[in-house]
Curated annotation (Swiss-Prot):
It comes from Oryza sativa subsp. japonica (Rice). One of its GO terms (cellular component) is transcription regulator complex. Belongs to the retinoblastoma protein (RB) family. GO terms for biological process: cell differentiation; negative regulation of G1/S transition of mitotic cell cycle; regulation of transcription by RNA polymerase II. Residues 958-971 have a biased composition (Low complexity). Residues 385-832 are annotated as: Pocket. It is found in: Nucleus. This is Retinoblastoma-related protein 2. Keywords: Cell cycle, Nucleus, Repressor, Transcription, Transcription regulation. The gene is RBR2. Residues 705-832 are annotated as: Domain B. Residues 586-704 are annotated as: Spacer. GO terms for molecular function: RNA polymerase II transcription regulatory region sequence-specific DNA binding. InterPro entries: Cyclin-like_sf (IPR036915), RB_A (IPR002720), RB_B (IPR002719), RB_C (IPR015030), RB_fam (IPR028309), RB_N (IPR024599).
């Protein structure tokens, strides 16, 4: 491509613009942008195995979309739409979104200079990608459900018939698109879309001739709900698809109105109309439209829908009709067949974190007991798709949370009133303000920042419903946390915790995020809740584990979502500029304060509730009365407990640096970074101001506790990823050394993580250890294997922050690839640690080590010095995992008959017998080569769901599907629960 004349590229772009009918202004500006960024855009290594022609098409599509979108929003003109661009370039949506992120990073300066610093937010690429995912999931659900209810196209056609099944399925999809254009809530989330599609299916079941059904009404397994009058249609569909009957009835009413207006037909009560379609169906509450799909008029009705769809379905950047008719054009071949396909570079959380792919195809399959002759030997495994996952979690929200009161319970009020001053009104007011900021209903500019060509993106009923769900979930978890803290501290007065503004906001943000994740919204993706609440990623990382631990009914899919969020927070977001992690580090590690201050990394003060109200233009009407200021002063950073929610957080960002610049560093353990002590750290210490003394041990600041907890989670995440990557490379022998180097860097060279991604340090550690170990392992091999990891993002190894000093002595920054970073930054910083590995591997005294294991003992774990990960993989070649015994199973195992079991709480198998004899017997059994086990496993003791939930991926994902187990600090409770 580099050898081609420069004019050839511009000529092909001009030809494409003519073919698409792009106006001269957009075409000329696109050519100018391409000319400025051509060198970076057309660098072929970015595109991997793609041909130069495909790479060029992707560049053209990206430039055209950027110019058309940004010029439109700037000048108000209408440009070419994304679906037209991709169709003209013969590209799939997922290919475009996969490459757009890296292309955007390459011409960031070009677009920023032309369209302003907010150009990336105005492009709405992430929202569009999620909308594509939603519509593809919805269309697959609709096609699958339709094929279950109606005959296949090959068997339905009758002689003389002018209508066939493809026409009916197309009719239903187009009707859904019309309904969607009239119902704003269908725009926002997958759950609402499914309710709309189920309503369309119900209408088709009533109106499509019965001869096209794949079942008979009587005795059907599709419609199992019965009344005295016959099959109860809507409850049966709700049972099949986990929808809400109330919402489905509401959606049916909206569908009736759309049909009445569009087809100019009067809806009549189905009970008043006699037709074979309604035989044996309870018609109470159902409406019927005469001649809606009859042969004589059906084709004209379908043409009307197609004509309207051509104008309403393509108003935005996407051609919505295409998701049904050309789904193979939307998706790649490898993604189009699976019901849980991935789109673009964003992995689905619950698939990325699923358990071993070699033995279990999808850990979201409904758990079932092992097949046996007693149960017929065959069990139907229900595969969990994005739709079934969303509907299952929505059912949990509907059944468990929606029935709760929308105010503090009597027990929670007891905790709030037991504080130094009654905090009930403060809590209620805070919930109202923060949730209004997340789900705006009263603000003047409601919906203007959401985009995606939807002026009323947050319509009031939808936002009010989500606010109600989030507030109920918040009150429920807050009460559970209060109960646990009261029991652990043996006090009912929880003033330090319950008056902590940051703690409450984190809990509210987590509740709102789960509500958004449950409904699979496309207009408000993470980290939107952080921006709305004034929190940082480090703040939210403190609450996730406690949230999971104290909400016992949380579905597995939502636990996986929180697990994925925590990984994002740990790996990069908490290390970004403006993270409150740096405010804690300057207290816990004063030696880092100079560099933190020079880089400008400190977080801004958390905005007060008054500031949030002013920013959102929230009208005070409808909000609880403002609580009076009861506390004369507050701790720094808005965290100390003597603070009302109304306090303005005005402390300077640099005050922590100035205050602690002369403070001696805290005493550390011999190993440098100390993993958390066994003692219990209350939540108040985690959320307290960094400069406040720890209530458990007054000789250390609360910042030390927070940093220790955070670093312990970083180490666990790194241990899992190092193990997986070493196994992929077939160099398991490097695992411990790489982990130890990483651990030392985190402790001794923490600044190496600033503004960077954890995986960048892992990759450099792996290459550095391989070099000093004299292994022929190249960076290319490491990166190629890293690309196969589920968390891989190209920018991890292509764009790494490097600080630099300009000519005027000021500090600047630039981004380089991982090899440049390794040579210029990593090696000079870590060289002493790497050199220390060289003599240790060949030291003679190591070979004469007298502390070798006792002969006959089982081989020690190669990961014995890693933090306690649960479950732990003990074999690189087999899917074998070991996890501590759950507390819930302890009592059942401690029956008198179970005393003969080995290794049960370390007790001897016989009275007064030495434990060494038991250990010798265990070793003998483990090492006996011809040992046979004649007993059968009793699955009654531990359920399949527990076993399945404890498995981890052999070559990717978290080692535990439970974030409380995989990322919890090393406390007694977390070890037990893991």
């Amino acid at each position: 491509m580099a050898s081609q004349p420069p004019a050839a590229v511009e000529a092909r772009l001009a030809d494409l613009c003519k073919e698409l009918g792009v106006d001269e202004g957009v075409a000329g500006e696109a050519a100018a942008v391409l000319e400025e960024g051509k060198g970076a855009l057309l660098a072929s290594p970015s595109f991997g195995s793609k041909s130069p022609e495909d790479a060029e098409k992707l560049c053209f599509a990206f430039v055209l979309y950027c110019v058309s979108k940004l010029k439109e929003t700037k000048a108000g003109s209408s440009g070419v739409r994304l679906w037209e661009i991709l169709k003209g370039c013969k590209l799939k949506y997922d290919d475009f979104f996969k490459e757009s992120q890296r292309l955007a990073s390459r011409i960031d300066q070009v677009l920023g200079s032309r369209y302003g610093s907010d150009w990336e937010a105005r492009l709405e690429l992430k929202q569009l990608e999620n909308l594509v995912n939603l519509l593809a999931d919805a269309s697959r659900f609709y096609c699958k459900a339709f094929n279950e209810l109606f005959l296949s196209p090959s068997t339905d056609q009758e002689p003389g018939s002018t209508t066939n099944i493809p026409d009916y399925i197309r009719f239903g999809w187009l009707l859904f698109l019309i309904l969607r254009s009239k119902s704003p809530e269908l725009f926002k989330d997958l759950v609402s879309c499914i309710h709309g599609l189920v309503a369309i299916l119900a209408i088709l079941l009533i109106h499509v001739p019965a001869k096209f059904r794949s079942f008979t009404i009587e005795g059907s397994s599709h419609l199992i709900k019965q009344t005295e009058k016959g099959v109860d249609l809507l409850p049966s569909l709700c049972h099949n698809y986990h929808t809400s009957e109330d919402r489905l009835k509401e959606m049916m009413g909206k569908s009736y109105k759309v049909i009445e207006v569009f087809f100019s037909r009067k809806a009549i009560n189905a009970s008043e109309f006699k037709t074979v379609n309604l035989d044996k169906i309870d018609t109470d509450g159902l409406m019927y439209f005469k001649d809606l799909v009859d042969d004589e008029i059906f084709q004209s009705n379908l043409e009307k829908l197609e004509k309207l769809s051509s104008t309403t379905g393509c108003q935005g950047e996407l051609d919505l009709e295409m998701f049904l008719t050309s789904n193979d054009y939307v998706l790649n071949a490898e993604n189009s067949s699976g019901s849980s396909a991935n789109f673009g570079c964003s992995k689905r959380v619950f698939e990325t974190l699923a358990s071993p792919t070699k033995t279990i195809k999808n850990m979201l399959a409904a758990p079932s007991s092992p097949s046996s002759p007693a149960n017929g030997g065959s069990i139907k495994i229900v595969q969990m798709t994005p739709v079934t996952s969303a509907m299952t979690t929505a059912k949990w929200l509907r059944d468990v949370i929606s029935s709760l009161p929308d105010k503090p319970s009597s027990k929670l009020e007891e905790f709030l009133s037991s504080c130094d001053t009654d905090l009930t009104s403060d809590v209620v007011k805070r919930v109202s303000i923060i949730l209004e900021a997340i789900f705006p209903t009263k603000s003047i500019d409601r919906g203007t920042s959401i985009g995606l060509n939807c002026a009323n993106a947050f319509d009031i009923p939808w936002a009010e419903a989500r606010k109600m769900e989030a507030s109920k979930l918040y009150y429920r978890v807050l009460e559970a946390i209060c109960r646990a803290e009261s029991q652990n501290n043996n006090v009912n007065n929880l003033t330090p915790l319950l008056s902590n503004e940051r703690f409450h906001r984190c809990l509210i943000a987590c509740s709102a995020e789960l509500v958004l994740a449950t409904h699979k919204t496309v207009i408000m993706m993470f980290p939107a809740v952080l921006e709305s609440t004034g929190l940082t990623a480090f703040d939210l990382s403190k609450i996730i584990e406690n949230f999971v631990r104290h909400e016992e009914t949380l579905p597995r899919e939502l636990k996986r979502h929180l697990n994925s969020l925590e990984e994002q927070l740990l790996e990069s977001m908490s290390w970004e500029k403006g993270s409150s992690l740096y405010n804690s580090l300057v207290v816990a590690r004063p030696s880092l304060s100079t560099e933190i201050n020079s880089l400008g990394l400190l977080a801004e003060p958390m905005p007060s509730l008054d500031g949030i109200v002013a920013r959102q233009s929230i009208h005070p009407d409808g909000l609880p009365p403002t609580p009076s200021k009861r506390w004369p002063s507050a701790g720094p950073d808005g965290n100390c407990y003597p603070q009302s929610p109304k306090r303005l957080c005005t402390e300077s960002r640099n005050s922590l640096v100035e205050r602690n610049s002369q403070t001696p560093p805290p005493k550390q353990s011999q190993t440098g970074l100390s993993i958390l002590k066994a003692k219990y750290h209350p939540l108040q210490a985690t959320f307290a101001s960094p400069t406040v003394s720890n209530p458990v041990s007054g000789n250390e600041k609360c910042a030390v506790v927070g940093v220790q907890i955070f670093f312990s989670k970083i180490l666990k995440l790194a241990a899992i990823r190092i193990r997986n990557l070493c196994e992929r490379l077939r160099h398991e022998e490097l695992t411990v050394s790489v982990y130890n180097i990483f651990k030392q860097i985190l402790d001794q060279q923490t600044a190496l993580f600033f503004n960077r991604h954890v995986d960048q340090i892992i990759l450099c550690c792996l290459y550095g250890v391989a070099k000093v170990s004299q292994l022929s392992l190249t960076f290319k091999e490491i990166v190629n294997n890293y690309k196969r990891e589920p968390q891989c993002k190209p920018e991890v190894f292509r764009s790494i922050f490097v600080g630099s000093t300009n000519r005027n002595g000021g500090f600047g920054s630039r981004h380089v690839d991982i090899i440049v970073f390794y040579n210029q930054v990593f090696v000079p910083t870590v060289k002493p640690l790497l050199v220390a590995l060289m003599p240790s591997s060949t030291r003679p005294e190591d070979k004469r080590n007298t502390n070798s294991q006792i002969p006959g003992s089982p081989k020690s774990s190669p990961f014995s010095n890693l933090p306690d990960m649960s479950p732990k993989k003990v074999s690189s070649s087999h899917n074998v995992y070991v996890s501590p015994l759950r507390q819930t199973k302890m009592d059942a195992l401690l029956s008198p008959s179970s005393r003969s079991f080995y290794a049960c709480i370390g007790e001897s198998t016989q009275a007064f017998q030495s434990p060494s004899k038991d250990l010798a017997a265990i070793n003998s059994r483990l090492n006996y080569p011809t040992r046979r086990i004649n007993t059968r496993i009793n699955f009654d003791m531990v359920s399949d769901s527990v076993v399945a939930g404890s498995l981890g991926q052999p070559n990717g994902g978290s080692a535990s599907s439970d974030p409380a187990a995989a990322f919890s600090p090393l406390s007694k409770k977390s070890k037990t629960d893991s």
